[in-house]
From Swiss-Prot:
Residues 1-123 are cytoplasmic. Residues 272-299, 492-518 form the PLD phosphodiesterase domain. Its main location: membrane. It comes from Caenorhabditis elegans. It catalyses: a 1,2-diacyl-sn-glycero-3-phosphocholine + H2O = a 1,2-diacyl-sn-glycero-3-phosphate + choline + H(+). Keywords: Glycoprotein, Hydrolase, Lipid degradation, Lipid metabolism, Membrane, Repeat, Signal-anchor, Transmembrane, Transmembrane helix. InterPro entries: Diverse_PLD-related, PLDc_3, PLipase_D/transphosphatidylase. Glycans are attached at N181, N208, N244, N266, N333, N350, N468, N513. This is Probable phospholipase D F09G2.8.
Length: 554
């Protein structure tokens, strides 16, 4: 007995227009005809049976090589029939229409199906609609969470301009080193050229004093900030709120005179310990400074500092602005760290995906790293991870200049612990054949335990594997000491306060000392650039200091 297609839809069909009923009749008849042919071909030897041709719409249905019917024409005819079916001209139609685009027919099929036993489609519409709305909300609602990042100027991620950069330094009075770009002059230039906005992240304030002759640079910078506020530049300052290193009278005066808005970030309240150790200036979301210098006159004339300036570079400035915006948000009263930072705070730029730009006429790549982890939205490279990856990427040379180097935490009281993350990366680099040179500061406040840790790094050289019989990695350590400035003794001065690293490919300039606390619970940032010219400039500074009379073997 021939197989017959059971039309379940016909048993539960809603009331339909004649055109739709006719469509179902056509489809049913054609399916029955096709199945009869399938059954005949299935149970008979196709090689012994004469070829039979089935006509559909007066066209022959072809067969495949094994005698089965070719479905192509049938499916296309069925599709064509479903798209256009005859209609009654008495009802105002032109003789052909598509029930799938007939709004009235759709309503009848989906919403008015007669008595309850015929309601097939309507109940399904409800859960499908709910699921669809849920998916839409899940995917698109986060995209509307942009109001949390208030930006006075449209941020950009595309670097279409040639960014000008300057390596800037503070050279303590009495050191014979020369620099083309002094930190104080760079700051004053940035501030004086600000037209609308000036955002500053600072640990503490100590610019405006006349107690010492060398404090003139500090006063000049502070006067530049006052001038900017008076000419209408909107100044915002995000400063540490828990360290008690200064009474911050200078920022308080700016607020009192209506020249600036200040917010304090209490890192200890937010994550249990830590401070804002970041130092950067951002002008008009276009020009910026990142470096080791504090807003302290000593950092401009009595302490050795290193930083970098990006001039008229909106893409880099926009990325730094997101970090400032996070600080600004955390400076609100009763603020909490978001469980998940809004999308608008995210960055696409990190070690795995550096931003491409033109820097001083040459191709370059960059990203900005930050710590601690809870302050970082998605995409932002943690400062520690940046250091580790840069060392892992090095093939020939790693040169490090930092004030403090201790593989432990220092400020967690009874909870201090061994912290070997950077120490292990240094050893790993040397083991792979990289020449590691470390220039560490020595001054009145250096910790005694630092020297044994440095010696332990240096002594591994003799145990490192040799490559090509003669070549092998090594760790060399030198101590850099800034001599006193005559008879004048100024507290917390005469030290190399720089925090940078340079390899054969990458220049890293940061704001953090190299001990555990600065990456676990202290806020800091770093600029990372991959460009031959940038690395050469920073390498020249390192080599100058390394080979100077102020550098001694450990």
């Amino acid at each position: 007995m021939p197989l017959r297609l059971i039309n379940f839809r016909q048993q539960r069909r809603c009331r339909q227009s004649p055109s739709v009923a006719r469509l179902e009749s056509i489809v049913l008849n054609r399916r029955e005809l096709l199945l009869d042919h399938f059954q005949y071909s299935l149970f008979q030897n196709s090689s012994e049976i004469p070829m039979t041709t089935i006509l559909i719409n007066d066209r022959p249905m072809r067969h495949t090589h094994d005698g089965r019917a070719d479905m192509t024409n049938f499916e296309m005819d069925l599709f064509d029939t479903r798209i256009e079916v005859p209609t009654s001209k008495n009802s105002g139609g032109d003789g052909m229409h598509s029930p799938y685009y007939d709004e009235e027919s759709s309503k009848k099929r989906c919403c008015k199906c007669g008595n309850s036993r015929n309601r097939i489609i309507k109940p399904a519409c409800v859960p499908i609609s709910i699921v669809s709305l849920f998916i839409i909300a899940l995917v698109f609602l986060p995209l509307f969470n942009e109001e949390d990042l208030a930006s006075p100027i449209k941020l950009t991620t595309g670097c279409s301009v040639d960014c000008k950069t300057f390596l800037v330094e503070s050279i303590p009075i009495g050191l014979p080193f020369k620099t083309n770009n002094h930190t104080a002059e760079a700051w004053i230039n940035i501030i004086d050229n600000s037209k609308q906005y000036l955002d500053i992240s600072v640990m503490y304030w100590n610019l405006n004093t006349s107690d010492y002759k060398s404090s003139v640079y500090g006063r000049r910078v502070y006067e530049a900030i006052i001038r900017a506020g008076k000419r209408g530049v909107k100044i915002r300052i995000a400063q540490d709120g828990a360290s008690n290193l200064s009474d911050n009278k200078e920022s308080a005066y700016l607020v009192q005179e209506g020249l600036a808005e200040v917010r304090e970030i209490n890192v200890t309240r937010l994550i249990g310990s830590g401070i804002i150790h970041t130092k950067f200036i951002l002008s008009d979301i276009a020009t910026l400074y990142i470096g080791s210098a504090n807003m302290d006159w000593k950092s401009l004339s009595e302490v050795k500092e290193v930083g970098v300036v990006f001039q008229e570079c909106p893409c880099v400035a926009s990325d730094l602005y997101k970090i400032f915006a996070a600080y600004w948000k955390l400076g609100e009263n009763d603020s909490v760290i978001p469980e998940k930072w809004p999308i608008s705070y995210r960055t696409p730029f990190n070690f795995s995906s550096m931003a491409k730009l033109t820097m001083d006429g040459e191709p370059a790549e960059y990203f900005i790293s930050s710590s601690p982890g809870p302050f970082n939205p998605k995409g932002r490279e943690h400062d520690l991870a940046a250091i580790q990856k840069i060392m892992k990427d090095a093939r020939k040379s790693v040169c490090i200049s930092v004030m403090d180097y201790i593989p432990s935490t220092l400020y967690m009281k009874k909870s201090n612990r061994f912290w070997p993350e950077i120490d292990d990366s240094i050893r790993d680099a040397a083991y792979r054949g990289v020449n590691v040179r470390m220039l560490i500061s020595h001054w009145d406040h250096s910790r005694k335990e630092m020297i044994p840790f440095l010696k332990s790094l240096q002594t591994i050289t003799d145990g490192l594997p040799r490559y090509n019989r003669t070549e092998h990695g090594q760790v060399q350590v030198r101590i850099f000491t800034v001599p006193p400035n005559g008879k004048e003794k100024i507290p917390f001065t005469r030290v190399n306060h720089a925090k940078y690293m340079v390899t054969e490919d990458i220049a890293y300039i940061g704001t953090s000392n190299w001990s555990g606390d600065y990456f676990i619970s202290t806020a800091g940032v770093a600029m990372v650039v991959r460009q031959p010219s940038a690395t050469k400039r920073l390498q020249n500074v390192f080599d100058r200091d390394w080979n100077s009379e102020y550098s001694k073997d450990l």
